Amino acid sequence: LFNDLPVNVYKNAITVTQQVIIKDPIPAQLYGTIEVFLGKGDEFISDVFTYEAALEGGVAVDKDAQKIVLSTVDIQKPIVACGESGTHTDSGWLKVMFLGFLGGLIALLTPCVFPMIPVTVSFFTKRSSTRKGAIKNGVIYGLFIFLIYVAASIPFHLIGNVQPEIFNNISTSAWLNVVFFVIFIFFSISFFGFFEITLPSGIASKADSKSGLGSIGGIFFMALTLAIVSFSCTGPILGSLLVGTASGGAWQLTAGLAGFGLALALPFALFAIFPNWLQSLPKSGGWLDTVKKVLAFLELALAFKFLSNADLVMHWGLLKREVFVGIWALVSIGLTLYCFGILRLPHDYKGMKITLGRKLLGVVAFLFTLYLIPGITNTKYATLKFLSGFPPPLSYSLYEHHHAKEEGLEPNVINDYNKALALSKEQNKPILIDFTGWACVNCRKMEENVWTEPEVSSYIKENFILLSLYVDDKEKLPITERFSYTTLDGNKKEIVTIGDKWATFQAENFKQVTQPLYVVLNNKEQLISNPVGYTPNITEYLSWLKCSKNGFTKQ
């Protein structure tokens, strides 16, 4: 039971003492939890007890610092009706589904999937006594592939119903991002050809053994077998999709997996309907290995994005913007050398023929390398707007004063809500709240592509108090500002970090958990306009700002 560890056994009452060292200001009240494991007869019970203790000379809790719900905010009745509705549902799932579909098309070109198309279609054609039967079986097979990938998202819906912020917490978890970094490095080494990733053979064998069952059941297990045996190629692509959509919630995840499954399923269904098309398919060969190795370089670059996410939310300072861009430039150089046959990887050989398509890809990779190089410098050309959101922000730089950063709004940003509210009253300006995240791609795109536009930048500076609240900041709050909070839904959560506080503040008051989210309040903490999310259209965003400012003026 205790893994042979020595234990002390006590009966009846027991007093436990523990020395506690507090580096922060000492609070007037100390709250904590004790996890216990006790025996009563033959029954063993584990439980968690909370306690509180008064500390002499401690600092009293600042109630304003623990305020979450703004009673003055009515999400259904803003002062002016511009922007999105307060109960807006993100329609970005269509974009995610399209990206998932593209990921599925890429997966089709891998050595694990592509050769299966003619083999599977031929199997259905020969097995069925009529052409109609072959078409039916092929379509059912494709449908099962689609449903298998969609079904993979069901657990995430169950998790999301318990805590809506769970997806944002997952996507911004420092240690989870480090795990993904290691996994994607592992995937990329595999794609380079140094070893093969496979699921346990027993899983594939068990699914394959069921494929001989009656018509529908057999076809389902054939589809399941394909999903399992192709994992070594589809796994990295699926992993990118899962992580990329995690912060958008369960429905975006479902949309992405649906797009992926649809792309994989369509060829099997279409070739079953039109078997003559098989003759136009290119034959399997070395080009499939080339596709896999090109994907390896992409996976390697993506791995450092995950490490960067962890670095940003924890403020480790490991991957400053220039270091990150430099690593991507090295990966791009490696891809260039590979495409021209200068860099040889496992299964390549001296003198092998380099196709025109591979050479053209090498040219693209070389041009991309040239594009990245200014990103390492301290010049106005270092913005890399095409990649906005992927490298760390310009503020996270090796250079103390970055020239490219001067175009934006960063010097005017406040990160303290109470300070912003005081300035709003003092200057008679509305507060523009920017719910953002260190690991938020779309937040960086808005900051680097929209806020840097002179018209937008000057309008915000002149008319708003700009407040940026980071919902994924893992820095711990002073101990006097940590507390337990019961949400409006009745769930209890611990507010320990800066991110905990502002993520809860956003969800409770504005009923949304995605970033970026822009909210305008007046100095009475009333909602002026409907909040808006990611708005890359400069004219549309500026129009919303002007409408919000007019609403503040006319109130």
Which residue ranges define each predicted feature?
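Short, thiol/selenol-centered motifs that function as redox-active sites or metal-ligating centers
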Residues: 36-49, 112-116, 230-237, 435-448, ...
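Extracellular/lumen-exposed scaffold segments
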Residues: 1-90, 382
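Thiol-based oxidoreductase modules, predominantly thioredoxin-like and allied folds used
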Residues: 409-414, 436-438, 447-500
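Non-catalytic, surface beta->alpha helical segment in thiol-disulfide oxidoreductase systems
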Residues: 450-456, 486-554
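Short active-site neighborhood of thiol/selenol oxidoreductases, capturing the structured segment around
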Residues: 105-106, 426-444
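Hydrophobic, well-ordered secondary-structure elements that form the walls
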Residues: 262, 296, 435, 440, ...
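Hydrophobic alpha-helical segments characteristic of multipass inner/organellar membrane proteins
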Residues: 68-420, 427, 452, 469
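Loop/turn elements at helix/coil->beta-strand transitions in domains of secreted/extracellular proteins
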Residues: 427-431, 462-467, 513-516, 523-526
